[in-house]
Amino acid sequence: MYLKNISLRGFKSFANKSNMVFEPGISVIVGPNGSGKSNIVDAISWVLGEQSPKTLRGSSMVDVIFKSKKEELAIAEVSLTFDNKDNALPLEFNEVKFTRRVYSRGGSDYFINSSPCRLSDMIDVISEGGIGKGLYTIVSQGQINNIAILKPEERKQIIVEIIGISKHKNRRNKSKNNLEKA
């Protein structure tokens, strides 16, 4: 599984629809200061379930909607399309698209492959694939410094989370408990 495409419209500095296509492997987003690199990372975090406006560098969720002195949009929308040919996500599609919208009047909509869903449904599917806001999918510069100064055992725990071992341990423990009850 890999992120194949990001589509942004009305999100922070991206007033007009913008598409970014990625290939398998490591992708790097580069550009001069103020060109929107951090906003791309914020957009990814937002679709993956980020609920804290502060984490997205705002005071409320509507702050992600494009606003300038000349123009103010009523909606922000971001879609992340993942290649799912390896079935890492628990859906039987070769591509899975997650979309999140927020409206200036308040309220949000969420979609998986253009079908309406709840945020919790989207987060569940994303987490099953081993990605998500709490899973070190996105590591910022400040987090790298913090990880580097951790005690070895704390650092090991983070690595275990990153590679997905904790998810399997939790499933194993749940299965053990179910067997003991039976």
Language-model segments: residues:
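Gly/Lys-enriched N-terminal cap/neck module of very large, oligomeric protein machines
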Residues: 2-182
